[in-house]
Structure formats: structure tokens, C-alpha cells
Amino acid sequence: MKICGPKLSLCGLIISVWGIIQLVLMGLFFYINSVALIEDLPIDEEFNSVEEFYTAATSAYNQNAYNCWIAACIYVLTLLLSAQQFYVNSRATAN
């Protein structure tokens, strides 16, 4: 079933591949607690102790990593849809 044209399906392929690469890497950097990404954590500004901060930061890092990996999986679905549409469009032009 044809949903989109050849240009849009190719654009979807390219953007999906880039999104998968970027989100997997961001998830990896969040998972290893990269200091460069600390500004992106949804944590409070003030804590009573250092241990409380470390616990909240580790939890937020892990949650952001999982969110990135879930978004990468959604991009895989978009990649599959775009690849199927590219295949359908290439068969239609070959005949």
C-alpha cells in the first residue's frame, strides 16, 4: 500500500537513521553519567546532602537514558515504514 512518495520515503529513511544514531549515543552518554549532560536532568537545585544529590542524579540519568532508547526504538519503526514505502515506490517506477 502506497502512503507517501519516493522523495518523502527517502527523507524518512535518512532522518530515521540519523535519529537512531543520535538517540542511541545520547542514551549511552546518559547511562554512563556524562557530566556534560547534567544540565538536562530534571532534578531540584538544592539538596540536603551530597548522597541525596548523587541518588537523584543517578536516577535521572538512568531515566533519561531509557527515554532516549525508547525514542530510538520509535525511530526504528519509522525507518521500517520508510523503507517499505521506498521499496513500494521503487517497484512502481521499475514496472
From Swiss-Prot:
Which positions, given as ranges, span the membrane? 12-32, 68-88
Provide the membrane topology annotation: Multi-pass membrane protein
Q: Does the keyword Metal-binding apply?
A: no
Q: Which domain of life is it from?
A: Eukaryota
**What are the recorded GO MF terms, alphabetically?**
RNA endonuclease activity
Return the EC number. Answer: 3.1.-.-
GO cellular component labels? membrane
Tell me, what controls this protein's activity?
Inhibited by Zn(2+) and Hg(2+), while it is unaffected by Ca(2+).
UniProt keyword annotation of Secreted present: no
Keywords tagged on the record: Endonuclease, Hydrolase, Membrane, Nuclease, Transmembrane, Transmembrane helix
Q: Where in the cell is it found?
A: Membrane
The record's family statement is: Belongs to the RNase K family.
The function of this protein is: Endoribonuclease which displays activity against poly(C) and poly(U) synthetic substrates, as well as rRNA.
**UniProt name for this protein:** Ribonuclease kappa-B
Organism (species): Ceratitis capitata (Mediterranean fruit fly)
- Lineage of producing organism: Eukaryota, Metazoa, Ecdysozoa, Arthropoda, Hexapoda
